[in-house]
A protein has these predicted regions:
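Conserved NAD+-utilizing ADP-ribose enzyme module
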Residues: 1-2, 9-13, 17-30, 56-58, ...
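Short, functional N-terminal and low-complexity linear motifs
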Residues: 5-10, 36-39
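Short, well-structured hydrophobic secondary-structure segments
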Residues: 39-70
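Membrane-interacting alpha-helical segments
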Residues: 20-50
Length: 189
């Protein structure tokens, strides 16, 4: 599988010297804010038998699809790093069985601890939300966590109310030097 990961320039140095790069939990941005979501995703990787090195707590992230296209990110877009930061876009090839794909937009249901319902329009969504709020907290929580499985459906859908697969992210445990196909440098906007 061909993927692209956006990393600080130091990661290129780590790959050159150590031959492998992994996530350092202490340096992971947003870990404290999204601890539960990240650990849920790690658990999902484990449930899918993605080989998990025992010394690693968090995976690395990469892009698979942007704007419904499987191609490297457009460096002119915002959100690929802190504005003004010099970054490296590392293109690499990794075996499919070492990767878990998910819909980037849907991932926000997990990050924000929200129920991911099946509404097809706003009226239906309001009705579903009203019903959901009447449930016991333990039932709501189970429904919410169960609903998150939908983030792993990356089938492209372009709808007025429902869209899916426009932005697909990938998580994996290790980036090895021999996986790297190319590195492009850019300044984040």
């Amino acid at each position: 599988m061909l993927l692209w990961t956006i990393q600080p320039l130091e990661v290129v140095d780590i790959l050159e010297t150590k031959g492998i790069f992994t996530c350092d939990t202490n340096l992971s941005e947003n870990f404290e804010d999204f601890h539960d979501a990240y650990l849920w995703l790690v658990d999902e990787m484990d449930k899918r038998n993605i080989p998990h090195p025992t010394n690693l707590s968090l995976p690395l992230w990469a892009w698979h699809t942007r704007n419904y296209k499987h191609k490297k990110p457009d460096f002119r877009t915002i959100g690929l790093g802190c504005p003004g930061e010099k970054c490296a876009c590392i293109e690499f090839e990794i075996p499919d069985e070492l990767v878990l794909l998910s819909d980037y937009n849907s991932w926000h249901y997990v990050l924000n601890k929200m129920w991911f319902d099946d509404s097809k329009n706003e009226e239906e969504w309001e009705k579903n939300q009203d019903w959901y709020e009447t449930l016991e907290p333990s039932i709501r929580n189970k429904m919410m966590v169960d609903s998150w499985q939908k983030i792993f459906d990356v089938t492209p859908i372009k709808g007025e109310w429902v869209s899916n697969g426009a932005y697909v992210q990938a998580v994996f445990w290790e980036l090895k030097k021999d996986m790297v196909k190319s590195i492009k440098y850019f300044t984040a906007r």
